[in-house]
Regions:
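Long, largely alpha-helical accessory region at the distal end of helicase-like NTP-driven motors
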Residues: 2-86
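Generic alpha-helical secondary structure signal
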Residues: 17, 34-35, 41, 45, ...
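Charge-dense, extended regions
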Residues: 103-213
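Acidic, glycine-rich low-complexity segments with interspersed aromatic residues
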Residues: 35, 47-56, 61, 65-66, ...
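C-terminal, active-site-flanking charged/polar segments
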Residues: 1, 287
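Terminal accessory regions of large proteins
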Residues: 51-55, 59-146
Length: 287
């Protein structure tokens, strides 16, 4: 190439998936990778700027949803009325209408209100928005970051990369969801893309969980069970045909249990049931 590769070069030349760099716990961003391994790379961000780039790299740059990426794009041009501008742009460019649940979820993502209490500390600096009358503007801390042209350049490249990934991999959603059939999602992705108000740790989901507010009911199945798991979680979930699955409820349930009734009467109750299947727990991408 004759120069330090840009993020787009990884997709253009297909040498490696740069998301593996983002997912690496000792790196977390392409910026951090360059600082660590590229002698000619001289840009140095502040600790807060570095954390913001890591957050966007790890949580948003895969392109699984366009909303946060286009929101960040708006913040490079405007300081106020961000949500209103975002809704208008999504409607015009993507024919995508943002309902109240989705708007609340996006705002929570961009104000560090979506994570569980323990996870909030990790990205405590990553509050991009602040409330302004009936809309949101750029937070003071994020506004300060945007005064650094080097930070802005890294941010814009990252956002453009995410938007490109969205268009290639995630723009053909299933029905009226934010999900694409046969793509891989983490538990956190599922909670976010189903527009839950808060994230849930996998332990609390425990195979499935009904969210009353959004009336969504994701079911998570490990198809191959490990030999060392307890008998109470050694469920005999299996496909009997390509469109027929036998899935077992959580232990201690009866036909009258609320979660069982929600599943059996999902259509009548207006509940959306989503099925996520992974081969086994060794699939780190779908963790």
């Amino acid at each position: 190439l004759g120069h330090i590769p840009a993020l787009a070069d990884f997709d253009k030349y297909g040498e490696m998936d740069v998301l593996r760099i983002f997912d690496n716990n000792s790196l977390g961003s392409y910026y951090k990778f360059l600082v660590k391994y590229e002698k000619e790379y001289t840009i140095r961000l502040s600790e807060d700027e570095e954390k913001a780039i890591e957050f966007i790299s790890k949580k948003l740059a895969s392109g699984k949803r366009i909303h946060e990426l286009e929101l960040l794009k708006r913040t490079l041009q405007y300081r106020h009325g961000i949500i209103g501008r975002l809704r208008k742009y999504l409607s015009e460019k993507y024919h995508c209408e943002m309902d109240e649940h989705c708007m609340e979820n996006v705002i929570n993502m961009m104000t560090n209100e979506f994570p569980t209490s323990a996870a909030k500390k990790t990205y405590a600096q990553c509050v991009f928005l602040k409330k302004e009358q009936d809309d949101y503007g750029i937070s003071d801390a994020y506004g300060k970051m945007l005064e650094n042209p080097e930070f802005c350049a890294i941010l814009e490249e990252l956002v453009d990369f995410g938007i490109s990934r969205y268009k290639v991999n995630y723009s053909y959603q299933y029905q009226d969801t934010n999900l694409v059939l046969y793509q891989k999602y983490t538990y956190e992705d599922a909670c976010r893309l189903l527009n839950w108000e808060r994230n849930e740790v996998p332990l609390n989901i425990g195979g499935y969980k009904y969210d009353k507010k959004t009336k969504t009911f994701p079911i998570f199945i490990n198809y191959d069970k490990q030999d060392d798991i307890s008998d109470t979680t050694k469920y005999e979930d299996h496909f009997v045909a390509e469109n027929r699955l036998i899935a077992i409820s959580k232990s201690g349930r009866s036909m009258d249990s609320e979660d069982v009734q929600n599943f059996l009467n999902a259509t009548e109750r207006g509940i959306d049931v989503q099925l996520f299947v992974r081969k086994n727990k060794d699939d780190k991408i779908s963790k």
